[in-house]
Structures are given as structure tokens and as C-alpha cells.
């Protein structure tokens, strides 16, 4: 791993953050999930029957989304996640290769690929997730994949699963010990209630930073106010960034005062993947020497790009049309 950058944008060696092979930018390593996203939009569902709507298929998974947005921002990206030896796995591998995202391990796992069903009905989103091959994260492979990283993203999802918790925790700890900018993302608020969220907090304390949206922060702390929640979380993990949608984010470090960082005004088309784009922008700015508040500003700017298009990944264009319309 590459030591953390100082305020001048240089790491502990006195050199700029390490560039990824084949990329002009630093290498962001993302640990977590690779999924097929199936997005269903309908005004209302007919229980037990058919209804007209739209169905979109595309690559996803929180860590994969972060990697895709890191590449869109000009950085290198390495994804540590599982894919199955099936049609979905081959499609996902092709999507990663098209964007220049390195996948570790390169070999498919002996199971189906992960999938996420997103149903948007009357303005509400519901999710059904099957982690599939992502349950096959190996601790030694995960830690080995961190070599050369200028920054590290650890999704909360593998921390919330007993099968992958040790590997994700090891990634957070290795990054923290190396002094590399690293974050743990809180994943999803329904999964964090009570003691269930403790592995996420423990890993974030090792990495030094927790990213959470308003609902996740409230679930972890009991405080609905983002500023109060950020302060409570920062006292536990070091730095907390609470995302608040169009209102921006609140950043708090240690025992300091929470600092609001506004988001750019933009017309939102699809908020899917916005938090993951934020994470990519935040980490790349931290790797370049920005402080937490400055990095949060960079994150909101990349998130603004994400909400201006459909899908969790920045779309390639094929024949003038978006790959994922």
C-alpha cells in the first residue's frame, strides 16, 4: 500500500501518491460486492398479476460502483469481490474489463453471481439481495490485493455477513496500519439495528473513517440529526461523514465540531450509486492530500455527476446511446 498523502498532496515517502498501472491516477482498492442490478420501475405492483413498467439490467454492487466512479474520475481501480462461473459472471467480468477495472480474484467462484433486485413503486425503493459469489472472499487474497493502494474502500456488506467479516475487517485494519486513506461504508440501515452494526463501527475505527447516510447514522447512534450523529460517530471511529442527499454532507473529526458541506445544485435523474460516487471522490481527494471537509466537497461533486444519469455506473456509450439507458 502507498502511505497516506500529507497536506501537500504527497505521501510519507515525499513522492506523489502512486499511480495505478495503465492509469494516470492513484490506485483505489475497493473491497466488497460485485452484483447484477435488476431495476424495476412501476407505478404500482399487481400482486399475483402483471403490470406494465420498465426493467433495466446493469452491473452493480457497492464496491464495484465505487471502482467504476474512480475510473470515471481518472484513477486506477482494483475490485476485490466474487463473481460466479455463470452468464452473469461473464457479463460482469466484461463490464469491468471495458472500464479497466482489475478484478481480484480473477478466477470465478463455484457459485452463482450476486444479484440485486431494486423495485421502485410509487416513489419508494425496495431491495432484494443475493450475495452469491461474494460470500467467497478469502482473507489472504483480500489483504494481498491491497498492495500498491493509494486509498481503500471497504463496503459494510461483507462486514455484516459472518462468512466474509474477517476478510473485510482485515482489509480495514491493514489500511489503517499502513496510514493509507481508507473508509468503511455503513451499507444499509435496516441491517445495522442493535448489535448488528457493531462490526461496521469496529472496522471503521480501524480504517479511521465511516461513511453513512442519514438513516444509517441515526440507526447506529439513535440521533436523527445528522450533525449530532456525526459527532457521536466521530468520537468512536475518528472521522465520520454523514450524507444528507441534496443537502450535502456533515463531516466531523474526533472531538471537533461537525462541519456541513453543501452539495452542488443539480437535477437528479437517478440517485442510484450516488453514495458510491461520493466515496470515490472523497477517497481520491484524500489520497491527493485534501482534508476531510475538502474531500467531502470533491465527493459531492462526483455524486452530482452520478445523479444526472441512470444506473449505478457511469455509462459507456454504444452507437451514441448509453450502454445502460
PLM features: what roles do these ranges have?
Residues 1-29, 51, 174, 224-325:
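Conserved phosphate-binding/catalytic region of the ribokinase-like
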Residues 1-80, 87-94, 98, 268:
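Glycine-rich phosphate/adenosyl-contacting loop at the front of the ribokinase-like
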Residues 27-29, 150-151, 209:
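Structural motif
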Residues 33-34, 157, 277:
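Active-site metal-binding loops of divalent metal-dependent hydrolases
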Residues 45-50, 72-154, 324-325:
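Conserved N-terminal subdomain of the carbohydrate kinase-like
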Residues 70, 213, 275:
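Short, conserved phosphate/pyrophosphate- and ester-handling motifs at nucleotide-, phospho-/glycolipid
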Residues 162-168:
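Active-site-adjacent beta->alpha loops and helix N-cap segments on the catalytic face
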Residues 172-181, 186-258:
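Conserved phosphate/ATP/ADP-binding segment of small-molecule kinases
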